[in-house]
Amino acid sequence: SGTAPCTRPSTAARAAAAWDMGALAAQWFSDFLGQPCRLVRFDPEHLRLSSKKWTGDLDAHTQFADGFAVLVTSEASIDDLNERLVAKGHEAVGVERFRPNVVLGGVDAHDEDRIDGVHIAVGQGDEADTAELRHVKPCARCPIPNIDPATAQSSPAVSDTLSTYRSDKRLDGAITFGMNAVVARGAGQMLRVGQRFGAHYCFD
């Protein structure tokens, strides 16, 4: 074994330090996907900061994510979207189209927009602790949610429907769904389905 060479993949016009996982992995993925590609992992020594415009006094690190390490949405938000889609004669979609890390239950549709922090009970028994996510920026949506990840088929129905009710003045009218968040406390803790959480609501 040995250390693979460091490479700098480019994604969405950004560069990030990464470790190439070698020729064997590259060949497997190239054969499977039918096009030349490399498998890389982030360089743990490379620290990339999320925008201080949104994180304020918190130095929040991210790696290959678009701009922030965590995306939070809710079951009620995707249910609300699906009700609108079905009412227009379209099929319901899964929340995976929006690629969230955390999906909240027990809140109203788009309450994640009105929450500035989530405290999640992590650990078990005497080791119980709390992880804190700070919601910092609405997530402006590109056309990717229009694509069915199971079939790669694309339809404008999702974007067209979101555009009727999800224009966000905080981002100059951009269409948003979900909130970008950063880890304020509890980095390295494990999140699991069903963990209890508390939220701080804020209203402008």
Predicted regions and their residues:
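Metal-cofactor-dependent catalytic cores
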Residues: 1-204
